[in-house]
A protein has these predicted regions:
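Oxyanion-hole/transition-state-stabilizing segment in secreted/luminal serine hydrolases
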Residues: 1-10
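Catalytic His-Asp segment of secreted/periplasmic serine-dependent ester chemistry enzymes
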Residues: 37-124
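A short helix->loop->beta-strand "cap" motif at the edges of active sites that frequently abuts
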Residues: 26-30
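Generic structural signal for well-ordered alpha-helices
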Residues: 15-20, 53, 57
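Active-site neighborhood of glycoside hydrolase catalytic domains
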Residues: 18-25, 111-114
Length: 124
């Protein structure tokens, strides 16, 4: 994405509608969003990656959802190049290879387990 093509308002509107659709179908559902990872666009660093992540995180409080900040968890800007060098990201530096997706799943599992273990049911 080139900077002029990312429209945060449109992005947020789409996510708000998705959240509303989920809540209409399952009113008591807990919703966990996962932010984007760093990436390339047309073989160059995607200048919108941070803006996409920031927009998604802005939904947490007003929409009462949780969000795992995958972008920062993996290292933020430039992390896709590190992941590629380690064999986790594909040559396009947009998609992960199988091991990259496995790594993301393991990281998410670890985050969820830590959150569950630190949860105090006596507090809302």
């Amino acid at each position: 994405m080139v900077p002029r093509r990312f429209d945060p308002s449109r992005f947020l509107d789409h996510y708000r509608r998705l959240i509303a659709t989920i809540r209409a179908a399952v009113p008591d559902a807990e919703i966990l969003l996962v932010s984007n990872n760093d990436s390339h666009y047309r073989y160059r660093h995607n200048p919108n990656a941070q803006a996409v992540r920031d927009a998604m995180l802005s939904l947490v409080a007003p929409e009462r959802v949780a969000c795992w900040d995958l972008y920062n968890h993996l290292g933020g800007k430039g992390s896709i190049d590190v992941l590629h060098a380690a064999g986790y990201a594909a040559a396009d530096r947009l998609h992960m290879r199988k091991d990259g997706y496995i790594l993301m799943g393991e990281l998410l599992y670890e985050v969820l387990v830590r959150a569950a273990l630190s949860h105090n049911p006596a507090t809302p």
